[in-house]
């Protein structure tokens, strides 16, 4: 669910997910679509594509559990769809951390109507 995703992002980046990424660029947060503005926005684009592959669970509401051991996210989930969802969230959290140096405050609250035609997954 969005709760686990937010926790992972905080653990990996040290940033609070909603204010930092909830409205970032064209692909982060609700209703995001369009050509990614930068590497951080591309992380969110790839994450949305990952979610599109999920067929038996709802990323917004279904809950899974994970472990945080030695600063590493471990998706220890038995349900195949929830495990895949956890892996999607883990991947975006790591991607956001790896691209912290390109995080651009001008994209933090980006007007979605400025976003051009979306890339395809």
Swiss-Prot record:
PROSITE patterns: PA2_ASP, PA2_HIS. Disulfide bonds join 26-115, 28-44, 43-95, 49-121, 50-88, 57-81, 75-86. InterPro entries: PLipase_A2, PLipase_A2_Asp_AS, PLipase_A2_dom, PLipase_A2_dom_sf, PLipase_A2_His_AS. Keywords: Antibiotic, Antimicrobial, Disulfide bond, Myotoxin, Secreted, Toxin. The record marks 114 as: Hydrophobic membrane-disruption site (MDiS). It comes from the Eukaryota. Belongs to the phospholipase A2 family. Group II subfamily. K49 sub-subfamily. Snake venom phospholipase A2 (PLA2) that lacks enzymatic inactivity. It shows antibacterial activity against both Gram-negative and Gram-positive bacteria, including methicillin-resistant strains. In vivo, it causes local muscular damage, but no systemic damage (intravenous administration does not elevate plasma creatine kinase). Also causes an inflammatory activity that is demonstrated by mice paw edema induction and pro-inflammatory cytokine IL-6 elevation. A model of myotoxic mechanism has been proposed: an apo Lys49-PLA2 is activated by the entrance of a hydrophobic molecule (e.g. This is Basic phospholipase A2 CoaTx-II. It comes from Crotalus lutosus abyssus.
């Amino acid at each position: 669910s969005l709760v686990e995703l937010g926790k992972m992002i905080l653990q990996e980046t040290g940033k609070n997910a909603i204010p930092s990424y909830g409205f970032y660029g064209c692909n982060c947060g609700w209703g995001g679509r369009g050509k990614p503005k930068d590497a951080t926005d591309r992380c969110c684009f790839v994450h949305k594509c990952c979610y599109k592959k999920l067929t038996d669970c709802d990323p917004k509401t279904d809950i899974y559990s994970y472990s945080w051991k030695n600063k590493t996210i471990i998706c220890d989930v038995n349900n195949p769809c929830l495990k895949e969802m956890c892996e999607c969230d883990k991947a975006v959290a790591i991607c956001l951390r790896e691209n912290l140096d390109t995080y651009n405050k001008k994209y933090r609250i980006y007007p979605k109507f400025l976003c051009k035609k979306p890339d395809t997954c």
